Amino acid sequence: MNILVTGAKGMVGTALVNNLKNIRDGKNRTRNIEINEIYEYDLDSTEAELDEYCAKADFVFNLAGVNRPENPDDFMKGNFGFASQLLDTLKKHNNKAGIMLSSSVQATLAGRFGNSEYGRSKKAGEELFFEYGKETGAPVYVYRFVNLMGHSRPKYNSAISTFCWAVANDEEFTVNDRSTELEVLYIDDLVEGMFDLLEGKEQHCEFDGVETVLDENGRYCCVPVTHKATLGEIVDLLEEFKSQPISLMMPKCPDGSFAKKLFSLYLTYLPTDKFKYAMKMNCDDRGSFTELVHTVDCGQVSINISKPGITKGQHWHNSKWEQFIVVHGHGLIQERNINTGETVEFEVSGDNIEAIYM
């Protein structure tokens, strides 16, 4: 399969292209997708390149568009005008490849989006694609995305990116209303949704105002995994992430949670001098003890270094339990029943790593 990605250097395009390359190069074998060529088209590409790519593509992701033009009239030129050029070029080559359009929930023109010039331009692009599908028989997949959360330029089009950058870089920022709620789609979930599309497993939907309603016969497509959070909740999480190297407290980030995705995004904004941070080594004549990570509900991880011939321990706890793992050197671990005096012992070595319950 040859895949054309327009807007390939944008936030979504960059993430999608990088992940498509992982599949093409055999680094991601979790998907049933065979990729030969990935054609990357962006503002610095030529019409000749677009012509070549449209002749050869087996599937097209149209991510190109504008969202912050200096002149509002450029919304229609950037979002509708290029879409027309792309579809005309595909028609020229009689290429009926499937094509995906990246649209926006603003195209509903519902609620606060009723007067959105951006929404009108996206709506016009949608109708153009649907008409193209009727005219040519080519499969058309229109996605109306909510706020996207991924690594992008701060102070531009994403409050979350701006907050991540500001907190990570100790910059001042303003939250106008902590109660404002955002519905966001994380970039990794979007990419997985595009892989589902390539495998013929896309989700269809309709819209009730700005709300997505799953419908297997729906006109639109969607990535159903979104998250809702207030600006206050987002900023509080970011401040917690920032304090982690000091408190050592690992934030609660269950698999698939908004917190886990936000933490992953936050780390992409760290300046390089914050990639490394010091740990406090508590040293004495016996060796050292260093706490690495604390968790809210799963205890902590630490490193205990003992000098040769040193005995540590000689105490007990009521409910606390530990696992000792020797990763270097040799040692003898002895556990004693305080009621009977019975002792069991385990010889341990970094040459054969084992865990011992205490």
Model-derived regions, located:
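NAD(P)-dependent short-chain dehydrogenase/reductase
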Residues: F130-V142, V146-L182, I187-G200
